[in-house]
């Protein structure tokens, strides 16, 4: 017979299972105690098997279960003749049976409980049935005055009883969790804050156009703005910032990104927006612009895009532009007229474009890089930047 080992993950162990229905069972237990004092214990009969019984007792006046204690001062039989035997006896019971646990102890001369012994489980009692300990305590130990168990020749027995009563079941159906957490509206709320200029504390001027903003938000989103407001510069003292080399519409789109993390018009101004993102250290916006430019590379614009990527250290875009040039050059040498491979609507060679000719004069190092890459090109698949966009 083979056993199949299964592994339970820590996550499965930490989260409790959920059931469609459930039941809670309450087992009622009645607890009570009884004390029995046997005076002049040393005069008790010494014959093995002889019995002393206490009066009957119960948990209360309305309890129909009656109990008593039974003692064999010199043991129940020959095996236990050197011991005192002690039992709990069910005297009367209206039921067929009852289950109970019990604990016996002696009270010493200081009225302290000692020599405690208890049942390990709830035993089944029927009327006239008893349970207990045949060898409860050795007689010589009990009779030794030094042990203080028979003060004034009195044996005091203390009994605690726990009777199991009827159980009660409470059941029901689990209600499914119908709570629906609303979608996060942080971007919309921040956009509303930006559009409505509420609680603004600084002004940004772009070609004479004023933009109201919040310094804390600008500082949290842009390391450049953070340094600007943190240090005792003119912008920090007067809460007025003059933005240069950025078109107002481009700046507005950049501010929308700062507040909301989105830029719906990136494809219309990706080149200028990339420059602004680089200037204000908005890394995620910069990669978004790289992605847009990469998706829209053409034979006519690839040289300009390569220059832009080099100028603003957009390394992913730069690599993609060089790959594009290499691919189109290789396909051109093979006589391929599949315009889709070059993402172009013209068959004009890249090196004949005005952008390429301008790059030869203004950025000859890029031409050299393109040719070096072409010489060792393995024609890798063309795709969008591989760098994952960071969450705003």
UniProtKB/Swiss-Prot annotation:
CDD domains: BACK_SPOPL (cd18519), BTB_POZ_SPOPL (cd18343). The gene is spopl. GO terms for molecular function: ubiquitin protein ligase binding. InterPro entries: BTB/POZ_dom, MATH/TRAF_dom, SKP1/BTB/POZ_sf, TRAF-like. It comes from Xenopus laevis (African clawed frog). PANTHER family: SPECKLE-TYPE POZ PROTEIN. Pathway: Protein modification; protein ubiquitination. Belongs to the Tdpoz family. This is Speckle-type POZ protein-like. GO terms for biological process: negative regulation of protein ubiquitination; proteasome-mediated ubiquitin-dependent protein catabolic process; protein ubiquitination; regulation of proteolysis. Keywords: Nucleus, Ubl conjugation pathway.
């Amino acid at each position: 017979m083979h056993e199949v080992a299964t592994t339970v993950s820590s996550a499965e162990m930490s989260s409790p299972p959920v059931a469609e229905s459930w039941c809670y069972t309450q087992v009622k237990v009645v607890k009570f105690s009884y004390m029995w004092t046997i005076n002049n214990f040393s005069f008790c009969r010494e014959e093995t098997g002889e019995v002393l019984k206490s009066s009957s007792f119960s948990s209360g006046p309305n309890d129909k279960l009656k109990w008593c204690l039974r003692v064999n001062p010199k043991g129940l039989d020959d095996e236990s003749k050197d011991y005192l035997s002690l039992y709990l006896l069910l005297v009367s019971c209206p039921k067929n049976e009852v289950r109970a646990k019990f604990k016996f102890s002696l009270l010493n001369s200081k009225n302290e409980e000692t020599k405690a012994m208890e049942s390990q489980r709830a035993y089944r009692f029927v009327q006239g049935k008893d349970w207990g300990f045949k060898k409860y305590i050795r007689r010589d130990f009990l009779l030794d005055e030094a042990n203080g168990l028979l003060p004034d020749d009195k044996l005091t027995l203390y009994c605690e009883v726990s009777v199991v009563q009827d159980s009660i079941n409470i059941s029901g159906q689990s209600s499914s969790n119908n709570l629906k957490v609303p979608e996060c509206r942080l971007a919309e709320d921040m956009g509303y804050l930006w559009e409505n200029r509420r609680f603004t504390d600084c002004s940004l001027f772009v070609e004479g156009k004023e933009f109201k903003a919040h310094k804390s938000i600008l500082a949290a989103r842009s390391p450049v703005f953070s340094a600007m407001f943190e240090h005792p510069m003119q912008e920090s003292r007067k809460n007025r910032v003059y933005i240069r080399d950025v078109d107002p519409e481009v700046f507005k789109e950049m501010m929308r990104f700062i507040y909301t993390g989105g830029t719906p018009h990136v494809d219309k101004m990706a080149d200028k927006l990339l420059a602004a993102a680089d200037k204000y250290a908005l890394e995620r916006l910069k990669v978004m612009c790289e992605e847009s430019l990469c998706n829209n590379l053409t034979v006519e614009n690839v040289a300009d895009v390569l220059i832009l990527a080099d100028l603003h250290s957009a390394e992913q875009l730069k690599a993609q532009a060089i790959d594009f040039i290499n691919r189109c050059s290789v396909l051109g040498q093979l006589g391929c007229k599949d315009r889709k491979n070059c993402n172009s609507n013209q068959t004009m060679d890249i090196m004949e474009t005005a952008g390429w000719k301008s790059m030869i004069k203004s950025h000859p190092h890029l031409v050299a890089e393109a040719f070096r890459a072409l010489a060792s090109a393995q024609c890798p698949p063309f795709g969008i930047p591989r760098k994952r966009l960071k969450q705003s």
